[in-house]
Swiss-Prot record:
<keyword id="KW-0862">Zinc</keyword>
<dbReference type="GO" id="GO:0005886">
    <property type="term" value="C:plasma membrane"/>
</dbReference>
<dbReference type="InterPro" id="IPR011115">
    <property type="entry name" value="SecA_DEAD"/>
</dbReference>
<dbReference type="GO" id="GO:0005524">
    <property type="term" value="F:ATP binding"/>
</dbReference>
<dbReference type="GO" id="GO:0017038">
    <property type="term" value="P:protein import"/>
</dbReference>
<keyword id="KW-0963">Cytoplasm</keyword>
<keyword id="KW-0997">Cell inner membrane</keyword>
<keyword id="KW-0653">Protein transport</keyword>
<feature type="binding site">
    <location>
        <position position="930"/>
    </location>
    <ligand>
        <name>Zn(2+)</name>
    </ligand>
</feature>
<dbReference type="Pfam" id="PF07517">
    <property type="entry name" value="SecA_DEAD"/>
</dbReference>
<dbReference type="Pfam" id="PF01043">
    <property type="entry name" value="SecA_PP_bind"/>
</dbReference>
<feature type="binding site">
    <location>
        <position position="942"/>
    </location>
    <ligand>
        <name>Zn(2+)</name>
    </ligand>
</feature>
<keyword id="KW-0479">Metal-binding</keyword>
<dbReference type="Pfam" id="PF02810">
    <property type="entry name" value="SEC-C"/>
</dbReference>
<dbReference type="GO" id="GO:0031522">
    <property type="term" value="C:cell envelope Sec protein transport complex"/>
</dbReference>
<dbReference type="InterPro" id="IPR011116">
    <property type="entry name" value="SecA_Wing/Scaffold"/>
</dbReference>
<keyword id="KW-1003">Cell membrane</keyword>
Length: 946
């Protein structure tokens, strides 16, 4: 109460911050006449003037007022749009590295140009991040007119570009692109072997559009570049046949936690099935040797019990394609990891693709935290303000709307069953359609959108494609005649290519649009329809200028007439029935776009995004949610109590309960889910930070190595450290000479580097110490390497050293990632032993990293000591074996040796191999037993150094 009173007297922190910008807004407005008087050339010249002032010592903050005034004038001259005062405030928030929360239709795209231009003056590059390729191309072309007018270059990063095109785009002053493309380019850059092949040029400043969608909704989804492992499709198909043979009592499903576990009875049944199929080793499913089998069984269970077709994924062209739960879009090319995607493929009887090994990965949380300055824009961020500040140190600033919001948000209607709910939605859609009010029905999944579509079809409605001119002509003709055409369109992941057109036309009189979650759609719904879309469809093909101008005038008049129809499509509802002579009391509901929500989402933000599609820029509109006790959120969070209450109230079939209390109860349930999801994301980030710290060390190390003309000093240091570790292993510190394992040391040296060094003779010398052994070994190793340099030349050896070092580092890093993944899966069990899983993970991950570093020194030393290089002009008995690293974008061989070829592998008969002389082994298959007699596979023994 006291807090509310204080806010009334002094305003909220947000109000005070917004008020603090007014001085600079006034200064920008005061400059407007002066800037407007400049010629185009003089206005363009201001960019060079600003850059000169920066070079002379001024800061970007010093230039904010004149730079913003310049952009505002350039926008007026190129786009015919002038930044409102509130948009100037939004630009200041972005420049300060925070989140500008701006309602739908307030011009976020235009706002970004202010901060983008100002920060691009520094010449370090500015990245504007969008959620899809369409928006990246649209915004770069649209806003690029402003930047181009002011003498700045604009690039765009979309799927399908080669490295040269990407380099050119990143070299521009301003680069537009999707979050996925930026992240994958970063990962690919850190798999390159030459600095000149890298495409990004640092992470200076990024503005993220739909920041909540990217940094919250997708925060738990890592970007992964992977390579195929051995084919195990038969095993997945075998395991999949067992799951339908289980009863529901054989496993427990926790929908809140998204987990499924076998009961005792289920475990016994699975063990019997596995044993009969010859897939179980030992007696128990949980024996150590069955760890992989347990993993596959768990993933198959999850695929059947937790994942639903047409909700979590769709099946198309013999593929399982993931559906983004927040946007309803197909995530083409994305695959679930850890074998889950293969389990889904087996479940749906499509081709099971090989499992992949992670080659490189990063989460959006860690990628975007690399930027020196990060900012974001969205229509809905305040509900997640704590998370934005906690994880990204971004404050959310609510920007006032240019005009007051005139949308009416009504209380939810709650029904007993989904069938009753759908019937009520259908009735509401019919009422709105009769008065020509456009309706947008939001659904939580593709499945639900298609259920609603079937309801409409059964009641005489016809589905059309809003991108089809014939279908739209019918809708326009009906709108002109003022008669409902009973036509509807469906927007979901199946038709995502057309989503911008479908959304843009959702404001036409009588239009009915069914859409999955509207998060991140990025396209305004204008009352009466979209002028740009109609010109593109109806006038773009007209070549005659006069004819084209006439057509555009006709379209404009059409849209104005349609807008007027929509604004007048008010609804009069009875709020009190007639009593005696007293007439019924009625109330008017506004026209405009009518938003109908068919289900509450787990996140209030997604619901707010749906509501926010209506009421743009002061337009009237209304929104209402229709719910049932069978909806996921209601079912999982307390529908039993509500059901009992509705029964006591005597609620009949088809009747709904409408009360603000219901809305508050649902909001509390949503807050609980949001808090739980935040905790999950926060906890996952703590674990991912461990891997991220190691990733930064490896990636920074790679870049430093690529910068060096020669890594000779680095490999020499590695060689010497390896020798120190080797001697310490066989010659314990402060031990007597009699306790030294000289034979072991000699054998290890011979095994790893192939040199017969008289270590045993040295050890017999009087008074020799371990330091002397180290010195002598270093001298022998160094002389051996010097001989190779003398034989093949310094340039050739320097190239070989760098190639081998980078390749080996990459190989071991990939193996390390697999180890970290496995560790992360099981580390939670340490909690049962009263130990903190996070601290245990940090400790174990550090030990693994140290181990990897040790293996790197050993492997690089071994390979360089053994490498034989053959100049191309020397005759060869066998075809050469070359080292290749194919770039995934261009297909270029990044590891092509310009004038050098590694020596061919010789094939030797197994009978002629001497276990103690690796030089007699020739080529050994990776899965053969190692010729040394260890009993291990070659790839796990000497093959590690091959």
């Amino acid at each position: 109460m006291i807090g509310a009173l204080a806010r009334k007297l002094f305003g909220s922190a947000n109000d005070r911050r917004v008020k603090g910008y007014q001085t600079r807004v006034a200064a920008i407005n005061a400059l407007e006449p002066e800037v407007a008087a400049l010629s185009d050339e003089a206005l363009r010249a201001r960019t060079a003037e600003f850059r000169a002032e920066l070079a002379a010592g001024k800061t970007l903050d010093d230039l904010l007022v004149p730079a913003f005034a310049t952009v505002r004038e350039a926008a007026k001259r190129t786009l015919g749009q002038r930044h409102f005062d509130v948009q100037l405030i939004g630009g200041m928030v972005l420049h300060e590295g925070d989140i500008a929360e701006m309602k739908t239709g307030e011009g976020k795209t235009l706002v970004a140009t202010l901060a983008v231009y100002l920060n691009a003056l520094a010449g370090k590059g500015v990245h504007v991040v969008t959620v899809n390729d369409y928006l990246a191309k649209r915004d770069s072309g649209w806003m690029g007119q402003i930047y181009g007018f002011l003498g700045m270059t604009t690039g765009v990063i979309v799927h399908g570009l080669d490295d040269a095109q990407r380099q050119a785009a990143y070299a521009c002053d301003i680069t537009y692109g999707t979050n996925n493309e930026y992240g994958f380019d970063y990962l690919r850059d850190n798999m390159k072997y030459r600095l000149e092949d890298m495409v990004q040029r640092g992470h200076n400043f990024a503005i993220v559009d739909e920041v909540d969608s990217i940094l919250i909704d997708e925060a738990r989804t890592p970007l992964i570049i992977s390579g195929p492992l051995d084919d195990r499709s038969d095993f997945y198909n075998t395991i999949d046949t067992f799951i339908p043979r289980l009863d529901k009592s054989d496993y427990d499903v926790d929908e809140k936690q998204r987990t499924v576990t076998l009961t005792e009875a289920g475990m016994e049944k699975i063990e019997t099935l596995l044993r009969d199929a010859g897939q179980l080793r030992g007696e128990s499913l949980y024996d150590v040797e069955n760890v992989s089998v347990v993993h596959h069984v768990n993933q198959a269970l999850r695929a059947h019990a937790l994942f639903q077709r047409d909700k979590d994924y769709i099946v198309r062209n013999d593929e399982v394609v993931i559906i983004d739960e927040f946007t309803g879009r197909m995530m083409q090319g994305r695959r679930y990891s850890e074998g889950l995607h293969q389990a889904l493929e087996a479940k749906e009887h499509v081709t099971v693709q090989p499992e992949n090994q992670t080659l490189a990965s990063i989460t959006f949380q860690n990628y975007f935290r690399m930027y020196d300055k990060l900012a974001g824009m969205t229509g809905t961020a305040s509900t997640e303000a704590d998370e934005f500040f906690d994880i990204y140190k971004l404050e959310v600033v609510e920007i006032p709307t240019n005009l007051p919001i005139a949308r009416l948000d009504e209380d939810d209607e709650v029904y007993r069953t989904q069938q009753e709910k759908y019937a009520a939605i259908l009735a509401e859609v019919e009422r709105a359609n009769k008065r020509m009010q456009p309706v947008l029905v939001g659904t939580a999944s593709i499945e639900k959108s298609e259920v609603l579509a079937e309801y409409l079809k059964k009641n005489g409605y016809k589905q059309i494609d809003f991108t089809d001119p014939k279908g739209m002509d019918k809708l326009y003709a009906a709108a002109r005649a003022g008669k409902p055409a009973k036509l509807f369109a469906v927007l979901n992941a199946r038709f995502h290519e057309q989503e911008a057109y479908i959304v843009a036309e959702a404001g036409v009189p009588g239009a009915i649009t069914i859409a999955t979650n509207m998060a991140g759609r990025g396209t305004d719904i204008k009352l009466g329809g979209s002028l740009e879309m109609r010109i593109q469809q109806e006038a773009a093909h007209i070549t005659d200028e006069a004819e084209r101008a006439a057509k555009i005038t006709e379209i404009k008049a059409d849209i104005e007439r349609f807008r007027d129809i929509v604004l007048k499509a008010e609804d009069e509802i009875e709020i009190e029935p007639a009593k005696g002579n007293k007439p019924a009391k009625t109330a008017k509901r506004p026209g405009g776009l009518y938003i109908i929500g068919s289900e509450r989402h787990e996140s209030r933000r997604i619901d707010n995004q749906l509501r926010g599609r209506s009421g743009r820029q002061g337009d009237p509109g209304r929104s209402k949610f229709f719910l049932s006790l069978e909806d996921d959120l209601m079912r999982i969070f307390g529908s039993d109590k509500l059901d009992t209450m509705l029964t006591r109230l005597g609620l009949k079939e088809g009747e709904a309960i409408i009360h603000p209390w219901i809305n508050k109860a649902l909001e509390k349930a949503q807050q609980k889910v949001e808090a739980r999801n935040f905790d999950i994301r926060k906890n996952l980030l703590k674990f991912d930070d461990v891997q991220n710290d190691q990733r930064k060390v490896i990636f920074d190390q790679r870049i430093e190595l690529m910068k060096e003309d020669s890594v000779a000093e680095t490999v020499t240091d590695m060689r010497h450290t390896y020798i120190e570790d080797l001697v310490a292993k066989y010659v314990p510190e402060h031990a007597y000479a009699e306790q030294w394992d000289v034979a072991g040391l000699k054998a290890e040296v011979e095994r790893v580097v192939g040199l017969d060094i008289p270590v045993d003779e040295w050890a017999k010398e009087e008074g020799i110490a371990d330091e002397e052994l180290i010195t002598r070994l270093e001298r022998v190793f160094d002389e051996h390497m010097a001989a190779k340099v003398g034989q093949w030349g310094s340039d050739v050896m320097r190239y070989a050293e760098k190639s081998i070092l980078l390749q080996t580092l990459d190989h071991l890093w990939r193996e390390h990632l697999v180890m970290l993944d496995h560790l992360r899966q099981v580390i939670g069990l340490r909690g049962y032993g009263q130990r903190d899983p996070l601290q245990e993970y940090k400790s174990e991950a550090f030990n693994l990293f140290q181990e990897m570093s040790s293996h790197l020194r050993e492997a690089v030393t071994a390979q360089l000591m053994r490498v034989e290089i053959i100049p191309p002009d020397q005759p060869q008995e066998l075809p050469p074996m070359e080292v290749h690293k194919m770039d995934p974008d261009t297909g270029q061989d990044e590891m092509a040796l310009a004038n050098v070829t590694l020596a061919p592998a010789q094939t030797t008969d197994k009978a002629d191999r001497d276990p103690n002389k690796p030089e007699t082994w020739g080529k050994v298959g990776r899965n053969e037993d190692c010729p040394c007699g260890s009993g291990k596979k070659y790839k796990h023994c000497h093959g590690r150094y091959a």
